[in-house]
Swiss-Prot record:
Role according to the record: One of several proteins that assist in the late maturation steps of the functional core of the 30S ribosomal subunit. Associates with free 30S ribosomal subunits (but not with 30S subunits that are part of 70S ribosomes or polysomes). Required for efficient processing of 16S rRNA. May interact with the 5'-terminal helix region of 16S rRNA.
Subunit organization: Monomer. Binds 30S ribosomal subunits, but not 50S ribosomal subunits or 70S ribosomes.
Pfam family, one: RBFA
UniProt keywords, alphabetically: Cytoplasm, Ribosome biogenesis
Cellular component GO terms, alphabetical: cytoplasm
Family per record: Belongs to the RbfA family.
NCBIfam families per UniProt: PRK00521.3-4 (NF001806), rbfA (TIGR00082)
One GO term (biological process): maturation of SSU-rRNA
Protein name stated in the entry: Ribosome-binding factor A
InterPro entries in UniProt: KH_dom-like_a/b, RbfA, RbfA_dom_sf, Ribosome-bd_factorA_CS
Subcellular location: Cytoplasm
Organism of derivation: Wolinella succinogenes (strain ATCC 29543 / DSM 1740 / CCUG 13145 / JCM 31913 / LMG 7466 / NCTC 11488 / FDC 602W)
């Protein structure tokens, strides 16, 4: 796997800070409380995968949140442009980060195996 350039890493880091600010300016309270786990920009910085954390949202709520985020993408991009001074901003593709759920399931499996070995 090739290392990311320093400029790309800086862009991702800055977006990871600015996107939550943009979300906090929106009127939908479900969007205000979302946490940004990771931002992964494409090489040309035209697209960015934004991984979000909403641990207490149901699958239906997550679908609705993603729909609202698609509608608010322009506002979020405008905020990022004004906050950073950039002349272009990547298109955002929002996804929920499920790595913590997977880790919790693995921990539960390991705990169950440990109990079975002890008995």
């Amino acid at each position: 796997m090739k290392e990311k350039s320093v400029k790309l890493q800086r862009t991702e880091s800055l977006l990871k800070e600015v996107i939550p600010e943009a979300l906090s300016t929106l009127s939908d309270t479900r969007l205000n409380s979302l946490g940004v786990v990771e931002v992964d920009c494409s090489k040309g910085k035209y697209h960015a995968e934004v991984y979000l954390d909403a641990p207490f949202a149901t699958p239906e709520e997550k679908r609705e949140i993603l729909r609202q985020l698609r509608l608010a993408e322009g506002t979020i991009r405008d905020h990022c442009l004004s906050a950073t001074g950039w002349f272009k901003c990547p298109r955002f593709h929002f996804n929920f980060d499920d790595s913590t759920d997977k880790a919790n399931r693995l921990d539960a499996i390991f705990e169950q195996l440990k109990k079975e070995r002890e008995s």
